[in-house]
């Protein structure tokens, strides 16, 4: 069986650092519980990638967590300053990222920011229940940190002679992160653990079957947004992982950093050109039998 798959009071959050752990910044209110929440999730996610895929990050990673989106950027700026870095992008839109979401999250070089709805009371029950929701999402965002690290993409690189970012395509970046988020849910949390390979494939295929978005649509940086986009990207990366093994999703970014060429990296790892895979994906995304054969390596 394949198992898959009051503002001034909060403004100066206390950082928490540990060996082989992310640098945690969170609010002063309920600081111990929030730090424990983030630290436990960080440890579990790092162990998941190290134990299952031999993937580790030695460079510092900032992990910001808050229940107040209004001060998310203050935490982040303090964390970056402590690390001797500066924010290279526009401030994060905390309201958009966090508002009315059980867990909101985003990643960039070299940080992950997370937020959650403020509960009536902070206690151990809150920590445990929130941790169950937060950890898989952290696995998704930590995948992005691995992608940056493997590709040597901090600061972000450009494709030679263009203004386009080297790291990509967007569906590969987000689809891979979605795959490892799902794997964490299955392998660590036991979600859908009894599903066989066929059921897992069917479940992953369903959102892509409904979406009209193509992989070409999801190639530009930042194009993978919304359920349909994420579902399509997830299935595209999932097929590659089923066909070549999940480790191949990491190998692509490693070779991308060496070759500085998306096409070379993709063909070297998966034995197909991007163009060929885009064509194959359209052929199999709504055909379960064809998708099964492709995932098994029985068809090109």
Ranges and model annotations:
Residues 4-12:
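Sec-dependent N-terminal signal peptides
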Residues 41-45, 233-236, 277:
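Alpha-helical packing segments of well-folded alpha/beta enzyme cores
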């Amino acid at each position: 069986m394949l198992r898959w798959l009051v503002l001034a009071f909060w403004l100066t959050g206390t950082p928490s650092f540990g060996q082989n752990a992310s640098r945690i910044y969170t609010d002063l209110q309920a600081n111990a519980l929030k730090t424990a929440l983030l630290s436990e999730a960080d440890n579990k996610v790092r162990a998941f990638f190290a134990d299952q895929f031999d993937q580790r990050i030695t460079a510092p990673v900032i992990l910001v967590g808050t229940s107040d989106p209004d001060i998310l950027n203050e935490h982040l700026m303090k964390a970056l300053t402590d690390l001797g870095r500066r924010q290279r992008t526009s401030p994060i839109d905390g309201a958009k990222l966090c508002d009315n979401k059980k867990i909101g999250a985003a990643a960039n070089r070299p940080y992950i920011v997370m937020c959650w709805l403020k509960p009536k009371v902070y206690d151990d029950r809150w920590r445990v229940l929130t941790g169950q929701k937060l950890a898989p999402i952290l696995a998704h965002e930590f995948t992005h940190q691995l992608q940056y690290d493997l590709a040597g993409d901090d600061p972000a690189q450009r494709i030679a002679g263009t203004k386009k970012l080297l790291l990509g395509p967007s569906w590969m970046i987000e689809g891979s992160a979605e795959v490892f988020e799902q794997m964490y849910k299955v392998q660590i949390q036991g979600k859908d653990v009894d599903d066989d390979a066929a059921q897992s494939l069917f479940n992953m295929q369903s959102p892509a079957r409904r979406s009209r978005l193509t992989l070409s649509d999801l190639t530009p940086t930042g194009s993978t947004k919304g359920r349909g986009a994420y579902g399509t990207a997830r299935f595209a990366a999932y097929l590659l992982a089923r066909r070549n093994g999940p480790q191949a999703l990491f190998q692509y970014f490693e070779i991308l950093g060496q070759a500085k060429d998306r096409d070379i990296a993709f063909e070297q790892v998966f034995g197909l050109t991007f163009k060929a895979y885009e064509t194959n994906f359209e052929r199999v995304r709504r055909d379960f039998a064809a998708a099964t054969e492709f995932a098994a390596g029985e068809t090109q």
